[in-house]
Amino acid sequence: MGMGSNGELKYEISQNAYIKLVLHSLRHKTAAVNGVLVGRISPKDDGVVEISDSVPLFHSNLALLPPLEISLIMIEEHYVAQGLSIVGYFHANERFDDVELCGVAKNIGDHISRYFPQAPILLLNNKKLEALSKGKERSPVMQLCVKDASKNWRVVGADGGSKLLLKEPSANVVLSDYISSEKWKDVTDVDDHLDDVTKDWLNPGLFN
C-alpha cells in the first residue's frame, strides 16, 4: 500500500519518543505544553509513519510564532543527518479534563503538515494517563488526530488504538516506573534552552 490518505496510515511511536512527551507534560502539570514528533515514512512502503524521537517544545507562550519557527528549523537541522524530519505534533491541554483540540494546536499542526502532509497531532488524554497508574491502561495515553478529506482535524475514533501503535509493548510499564521515580523532573524543553543555552533540549541523559 502506498501513502494514501491519512485515514489509511498507521503511526508507530518508539518508547523513548512517547515517554519523553508524557514526562514533559507531567513536569508542567498546570500548563499547556507541546512538542514535535521526529521520524520518517517507513521504507517498507507499508503505510506506516515511524516516530522514532520527540522534542519537548514549550510550556509557556505556545502561540508565539517566532520562537516556534526558530525551534522547528533548529530541530530539522539536527535530525536531517540521520535521515529524519518533523513528522507530527504533540499537545497537552492546560485543563486535566480537556480533550478537545484547541486553536493553537490546530494552527501548529497545520504549519507542520505544510511540510509533511501526513503529520498527525497527538493529544494527551489525562484520564488514560491516570488509569495507567492503576495498571489498567495498555494503549497509548494519547488521542490520534488527523486531517480529513476537507482538511479539518478530527480525532480518530474508537479504532484509534489500531492506528497509533506503541513500537515496544512494554512502553506503558516503563512509563509507569518513570512516573513513580519522578523522572519527569529531568526533562528539558526548548523553552528551557532558550532561557539557558546550557540546558540541552535533546535530553541526552534522560534514559540512562
UniProtKB/Swiss-Prot annotation:
List GO terms (cellular component aspect). EMC complex; endoplasmic reticulum; plastid
Pfam families from the UniProt entry: UPF0172 (PF03665)
The record ties this protein, via InterPro entries, to: EMC8/9, MPN
- Residues forming the MPN domain are 11-146
Going by the entry's taxonomy, the superkingdom of the source organism is recorded as: Eukaryota
UniProt record similarity statement: Belongs to the EMC8/EMC9 family.
For this entry, the protein name equals ER membrane protein complex subunit 8/9 homolog
Q: Which organism is it from?
A: Arabidopsis thaliana
Q: What is the lineage of its organism?
A: Eukaryota, Viridiplantae, Streptophyta, Embryophyta, Tracheophyta
